[in-house]
Amino acid sequence: MKVLTFGEVMLRLKTPEHLKILQADTFEANYGGAEANVAVSLATLGDDVSYVTKVPEHQVGQAAVNEIRRFGVDTSRVLRGGGRVGIYYFEKGTNIRPTSVIYDRAYSAIAMAKAEEFDWEKLLDGVDFFYFSGITPAISTEIEKALENALALCREKKIQVVCDLNYRGKMWSTKDAQRVMRRLMAYVDVCIANDEDFESSLGIPAYDGDMSRGIE
């Protein structure tokens, strides 16, 4: 079984322990992203997994690729070019203080990529399953187009498509998410989501607050 995932890899800068960003004078650095994390998880379970993204041709971009590849993920399909890797700052919550995330991902290599840069005939060669999350089409309109091109070819090639709705309110509104995700659902074979994501991404009220309904 060959799996291909498509999305953005980012540099995560986390405050030590439970320090707030305002308190920190150092940050713990690592790399990840929804689709990259799925690729790594599947690879560690022994699956044959490839990952598609775009990163700059400098040491930070290469470090991101190295981090994913060291877990056994095939990174040979990663595109190179552009100016920067997206960053997010992570402040872990404690007690009643919630976790906080600040995105700095504008103008990243993948956000500035054009749809035609992704040669899906080659990228999907030999693939059995294609995975993406709702984060990917929110990156840019060009990546939305690139994703839909991939999905259309998956349908033609009878490649199974798996989507995790994974709604991110800091990236787009529910109106924009529903406009895009409802259309993309036509290509999806397996959809993964919690009740909040179903409502935010698709406008489907999947939970009415009555816990007792779980027994029905």
Could you tell me what each predicted segment is?
Residues 1-74, 113-115:
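Glycine-rich phosphate/adenosyl-contacting loop at the front of the ribokinase-like
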Residues 9, 135, 165:
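Active-site metal-binding loops of divalent metal-dependent hydrolases
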Residues 48-134:
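Conserved N-terminal subdomain of the carbohydrate kinase-like
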Residues 136, 167-169, 197:
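Active-site-proximal loop/turn and secondary-structure-junction residues that shape catalytic pockets
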Residues 171-216:
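Conserved phosphate/ATP/ADP-binding segment of small-molecule kinases
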